Amino acid sequence: MDVKAITACCEPVLTETLGEDEATELAGAFKVLADPARLRLLSMIANAPGGEGCACDLVGPLGRSQPTVSHHLGVLTDAGLITREKRGRWAWYRVVPERLAVLRDALGVPPDGSPGCC
């Protein structure tokens, strides 16, 4: 692999130095996503019909207890990665695309998910 050619064609991942507050915020969000169960929950919600998932439908596929799933959903909600809407007895969750875009941009991933020039 020609590293020089790849480096020459690709833009740097971070084009500006992160400030302390921005770095802390990004690190917190990435820490939340570092848990495999939370990462799976986020992907399950994002890929659910209509882009939203009911907490009641996430327990079985995740293979965790209802209290554990609720805890992880709360952590994702507190991090601003998903929103929660109460409908009757059930809570429905939806991904916050703008929040994920910030994380994607920090990693230098193009919006269309393509590998870019490399």
Where are these regions (language model features)?
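A cross-family signal for key residues in well-ordered alpha-helices
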Residues: 31, 40-43, 77, 83, ...
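Amphipathic alpha-helical dimerization/coiled-coil segments
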Residues: 1-25, 46-48, 97-118
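N-terminal helix-turn-helix DNA-binding core of bacterial DNA-binding proteins
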Residues: 20, 24-65, 91-99
